[in-house]
Amino acid sequence: VELSYLKPSEQKEFLEAIAGLQAIESGSITLLDDNGKGTELAGMDSISINKAGISLAFVPEDRIGMGLVGDMDMTDNMMLRSYRNGKSPFLDRKGPKALALKIKEQPEVMTPSISAPVRQMSGGNVQKVLVGREIAQNPKVLLVAFPTRGVDVNTSHVIYRLLNEQKKKGVAVVCVIEDLDVVLELCDRIAVFCGGKISGIEDGRTATKEEIGLLMTKHEKGGTLA
């Protein structure tokens, strides 16, 4: 699902609300399992979502800062995602190191060593590390904000391929993408917002730029993102 025509602050807040990082003033956020049973996420923070066994991953717009810690190496950044699941009082670096090595090979992160601070990497390689780490959690829901902003063309194709692979596995990928051509090619459904409300939800396989453009200028239709 692609979210179109939200203001930058709204895009950030919308995804953060689903991830439990932003409180909502009204409404609901319901996650349906394979049997159609709903779990209400509104009012739950990210720790509560994790403890509830809800498999949700988030690739934020802010790669260095909110997503990764720039002064840490790849292994330590993998540990940011795994330390809560440890049963021992001692931190286990074997699993995170193995994951770091795996991500270095695929999606082919260009770095002299997994021990190098991620801040020394290019923007594209930083994004590969972040996306690779989140996908490795085998999420049911993957939230992605501007996955290819500021990266080169080759890295963009790698990121789109990774997102497509997740979609084919049955993962619910909810993303914000700036390029409408990519949106129409990549997404099954497109939710268009106008004035902070959903003005329409279109089938990505049949929607046109003209239809999306019309929805960007009105908000009478309304809708529920499901």
Predicted regions and their residues:
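Glycine-rich phosphate-binding loops of nucleotide-dependent enzymes
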Residues: 1-226
